[in-house]
């Protein structure tokens, strides 16, 4: 990623602001697969009761402490499942993101993938980690599907959309679906002041 960042800087048009440096996870096989300026988005349209906020806070605390098995047990409890499927799915996606950072791609995919397809509109970042885990484990079609879904979700920052669109193009190319590459590259390139947008414009 540092080399790609330097390349992006060297090819940056004069009047454009420099792209933000990508933030990389601690362990990754593909260095470009860091956060890359992804902005965490709110859970649009989903209601949070006091109980829901408290339980999600417990999940976040367990995830931060890397107690992922405990977090998975918590969301299986009746009091959590009573919140509804979307809340359970958001918790699963959050747990899956930590499995990804720990290098457990299979666990990340199994935890986050179905949850992202069901409830990714509330937590688009779930598609990001499910997509990266899929890509890193060689499931390129699955990766492309997740990145496409994230890129198509409205209300995100230009950083998030350009990153998802760029990786959708990349995953489709590796998955030998060249007919699906140009659309996503164009979408990424429509945000030229972002890291991935600038890369897309040079491809």
Predicted features and spans:
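Solenoidal tandem-repeat scaffolds enriched in leucines and small polar residues
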Residues: 33-90, 94-95, 107
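Solenoid-like repeat scaffolds
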Residues: 1, 12-14, 25-32, 41-48, ...
């Amino acid at each position: 990623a540092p080399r790609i960042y330097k390349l992006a800087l060297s090819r940056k048009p004069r009047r454009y602001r420099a792209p933000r440096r990508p933030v990389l996870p601690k362990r990754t096989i593909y260095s470009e697969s860091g956060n890359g300026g992804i902005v965490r988005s709110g859970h649009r349209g989903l209601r949070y009761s006091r109980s829901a906020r408290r339980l999600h806070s417990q999940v976040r605390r367990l995830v931060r402490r890397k107690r992922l098995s405990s977090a998975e047990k918590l969301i299986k409890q009746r009091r959590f499942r009573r919140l509804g499927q979307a809340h359970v799915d958001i918790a699963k996606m959050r747990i899956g993101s930590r499995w990804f950072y720990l290098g457990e791609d299979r666990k990340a995919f199994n935890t986050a993938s179905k949850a992202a397809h069901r409830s990714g509109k509330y937590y688009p970042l779930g598609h990001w980690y499910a997509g990266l885990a899929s890509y890193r484990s060689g499931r390129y079609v699955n990766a492309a599907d997740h990145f496409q879904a994230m890129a198509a979700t409205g209300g995100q920052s230009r950083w998030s959309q350009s990153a998802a669109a760029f990786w959708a193009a990349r995953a489709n190319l590796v998955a030998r679906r060249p007919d699906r590459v140009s659309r996503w590259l164009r979408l990424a390139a429509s945000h030229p002041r972002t890291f991935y947008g600038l890369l897309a414009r040079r491809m």
